[in-house]
Design a protein with these regions (language model features):
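Cell-wall glycan-active module
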Residues: 1-216, 220-221, 226-297
Length: 297
């Protein structure tokens, strides 16, 4: 989805293109704990979570996001060129990858047909998005979603994250913009963190066990946590929305597309626009449609 830039391809490219971040694991989580408590989370439960050794401050997500936003705003030359991103996506078009997606489609044909009947989203589109998002559910992210979102939420002050930025990234010209966007993204992450904690509690999941993408998207369909209560579907009717189980994740994906304008017998142009609502990258949308076309052949 749109916040993921947030998916594994760009995450891996970012990690290669950024300077080496100083390691950091210690943080004073008190402001975040107090904020969550003020928002009616159980203080004891929240403190117990943050006291666990698995909770570490990770500056990489906010660092990447600020770099992305500043470069876009001030049109700086970025090391991540469109050609590199397109080359990364091109691997989804390899014959062996398409063959694996075709096998997945056949194996899950009954579930996928149910999705098409309910939402008019072709099974090839569902499988194509799943392939690009998580390689058919095999790669769910290489970091904990809780640490990512908590670290971003704690980084509302630019000075918290400045030591982990390239020295020449924030200039006198861009500093006010950087401070504003840092606050905005921290507030956004805080909302996602609250949703993640609720999701974990409602589903009996250890919040620290949930893997996530660069910016905290979770599940085989890669939803940001706030989207689960809006678009999540309990397809297997077990009383919970489990985005790590195929029926729920795939139906939720289709429900998201339907809610953003997907209709039966849409033109390719309109399909493209709806897919952009799932992820704002044009290369992403191009790849999804190309893979879907190949799956029909």
């Amino acid at each position: 989805m749109a916040r993921r830039l947030k998916f594994s391809i760009l995450a891996s490219i970012f990690s290669l293109s950024l300077f080496i971040l100083p390691s950091s694991s210690f943080a004073d989580w008190t402001p975040l704990i107090e904020r969550l408590t003020a928002d009616n989370f159980d203080e004891q439960v929240i403190r117990e979570i943050f006291d666990r050794p698995g909770v570490n401050f990770d500056p990489s997500a906010m660092s990447c996001k600020l770099k992305e936003l500043i470069n876009k705003r001030y049109k700086k030359q970025d090391t991540i060129s469109a050609s590199k991103v397109r080359a990364a996506y091109a691997r989804f078009l390899k014959p062996e990858v398409i063959a694996a997606a075709q096998t997945y489609l056949q194996k899950n044909r009954e579930t996928l047909q149910g999705i098409t009947d309910a939402y008019c989203v072709p099974k090839e589109i569902v499988v194509s998005i799943l392939l690009v998002e998580t390689e058919l559910g095999r790669h769910l992210g290489d970091r904990g979603a809780f640490n990512t979102l908590a670290s971003m939420a704690l980084s509302s002050d630019l000075e918290t994250i400045r030591p982990y930025l390239a020295p020449d990234l924030v200039t006198r010209r861009s500093e006010e913009f950087a401070r504003k966007r840092c606050r905005q993204k921290a507030d956004w992450a805080y909302g996602e963190l609250k949703a993640l904690i609720r999701y974990a509690s409602e589903n009996g999941i250890d919040p620290l066990s949930i893997p996530g993408s660069l910016y905290g998207a979770i599940g085989i369909c890669q939803f940001m946590p706030t989207k689960i209560s809006v678009y999540g579907v309990d397809a297997d009717r077990d009383g919970r929305v489990n985005l790590f189980a195929e029926p729920d994740a795939l139906y939720s994906m289709a429900n998201y597309l339907r809610s953003h304008g997907w209709r039966c017998d849409m033109s390719a142009k309109r399909q493209y626009r709806v897919i952009l609502a799932y992820n704002h990258s044009k290369i992403y949308a191009d790849t999804v449609l190309t893979v879907a076309k190949k799956l029909k052949e």
